């Protein structure tokens, strides 16, 4: 298993949660990046408010750490309604979901993170709730059991997932607003780092914010985490101000290189290059070679490496690109 304290892992760490809440934007106008998504949401939200209706159900998908939870909260704020949050693995029984649904008020947002991990029995309850705002409940057991329907107030379900392909087709089809989040560019990440530094009361210059941003793997959660670690270095080794020099030395000390890679990324790429002659190599063989689970490679390590053009997926397996060889100052065989 990948180490839980990996500094640049995009998944939420315990220490991230409280700090990230303070840094989260509350409204769309405060939200940086994802321009197409923001533009779409502004239209959908304004239209729903003009009609005095609940916003259509929304599926937000993309790699971890890009702001799916933040967007769900912004939607609730923009609509002026409450939000109740849960996650797929927590909803083990139909009654767990029923308890949440029956406590919603008109227009409220129900946010389900990791919605691809809903159990089939819970998913079945969700279908009529999403389509008809009705809840089917079984009363009694055996031959005497009967179904009753409860009317629900109009509500908005916001589902978030890193694996949209793992959703069943019937569930996916019930979301009227699908939104894909992409990795952030360095300019937008620099803006996020600067804003977070202001919230934290830190002194940071443009070059310092840029240095942190370019090593943050296109992910705001990682950018904020690196900012906190660079702050520690700046306070202990310097005068507390974060410059390009300070950020560069701090991140080198933390073993986060100029591309935002750490030892796990380098281990993966070097395994393809050295052990499998650049590939192609199947996912199971690659997982065995680096001692990780295939899901970890698919969900955590690969997305950014593929997006940046360091490895490729092919029908025959993973291959290291010329850019991967260049990163290690190696010559790619012809």
UniProtKB/Swiss-Prot annotation:
Has 3 domains, the large (RuvB-L) and small ATPase (RuvB-S) domains and the C-terminal head (RuvB-H) domain. The head domain binds DNA, while the ATPase domains jointly bind ATP, ADP or are empty depending on the state of the subunit in the translocation cycle. During a single DNA translocation step the structure of each domain remains the same, but their relative positions change. HAMAP family: DNA_HJ_migration_RuvB. ATP binds at residues 24, 65, 68-70, 131-133, 174, 184, 221. Homohexamer. Forms an RuvA(8)-RuvB(12)-Holliday junction (HJ) complex. HJ DNA is sandwiched between 2 RuvA tetramers; dsDNA enters through RuvA and exits via RuvB. An RuvB hexamer assembles on each DNA strand where it exits the tetramer. Each RuvB hexamer is contacted by two RuvA subunits (via domain III) on 2 adjacent RuvB subunits; this complex drives branch migration. In the full resolvosome a probable DNA-RuvA(4)-RuvB(12)-RuvC(2) complex forms which resolves the HJ. DNA binds at residues 294, 313, 318. Its EC number is 3.6.4.-. Gene3D superfamilies: 1.10.8.60, P-loop containing nucleotide triphosphate hydrolases, Winged helix-like DNA-binding domain superfamily/Winged helix DNA-binding domain. Disulfide bonds: none annotated. GO terms for molecular function: ATP binding; ATP hydrolysis activity; four-way junction DNA binding; four-way junction helicase activity. Keywords: ATP-binding, Cytoplasm, DNA damage, DNA recombination, DNA repair, DNA-binding, Hydrolase, Nucleotide-binding. This is Holliday junction branch migration complex subunit RuvB. The keyword Cytoplasm applies. GO terms for biological process: DNA recombination; DNA repair. It catalyses: ATP + H2O = ADP + phosphate + H(+). CDD domains: AAA. Belongs to the RuvB family. Residues 185-255 are annotated as: Small ATPAse domain (RuvB-S). It holds the Pfam family RuvB_N. Mg(2+) binds at residue 69. Residues 4-184 are annotated as: Large ATPase domain (RuvB-L). Residues 258-334 are annotated as: Head domain (RuvB-H). The RuvA-RuvB-RuvC complex processes Holliday junction (HJ) DNA during genetic recombination and DNA repair, while the RuvA-RuvB complex plays an important role in the rescue of blocked DNA replication forks via replication fork reversal (RFR). RuvA specifically binds to HJ cruciform DNA, conferring on it an open structure. The RuvB hexamer acts as an ATP-dependent pump, pulling dsDNA into and through the RuvAB complex. RuvB forms 2 homohexamers on either side of HJ DNA bound by 1 or 2 RuvA tetramers; 4 subunits per hexamer contact DNA at a time. The keyword Cell wall biogenesis/degradation does not apply.
